[in-house]
Amino acid sequence: VQDEIINKPKRMGHHMMAPLYFTALVKSGVLQVQEADDKKVAGILDLSNSMYYAHHHSLTIIQRGEAEALALASEGGTLLIDERTLRFMIETPQDLMSLLQFRMRRDVTMNEEKRKLFQKYCDNISIIRSSEIVAVAYEKGILSKYFEGEKREVLEACLYSLKSRGCSLSTDDIDDYLRMLG
């Protein structure tokens, strides 16, 4: 994960700011870098990237950083995932198959045996999304300490900001949050 968040982006001009920020968080002790078990990571990569097939070819679904995060969280932790593909793979693998079929415009099959084995890695993981953290911050009044404006407007702005930064939130999801909380 450190490689994907800090090391690789440092070499790409338009992504250089985030690695500087995360490096500072690690140095100050706010974030900790942990090493994942290589065997567990390899097992997760093997299963996840041989679970779905299109035209008799396996589909690469996750990368090493995601597998490392899963390996670390598989011991009863919580995993923050904004990326739809991995979240669907963990929570609703059948929906991921449908999404892949839609995106690829071809039939996709799922190896049920590998899905069951993969699911064993995920049984003890609690999944949360950034939008859920924003919702809790809104409910507890934390957002109003940092942002000026009407409460509902601040919530909406935060949710759209997450969406524009890669959180897999649809406009319907945002409307649902606003209806429930605003």
Give residue ranges: language-model regions.
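Active-site-proximal, substrate-binding regions of enzyme catalytic domains
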Residues: V1-G77, R84-G182
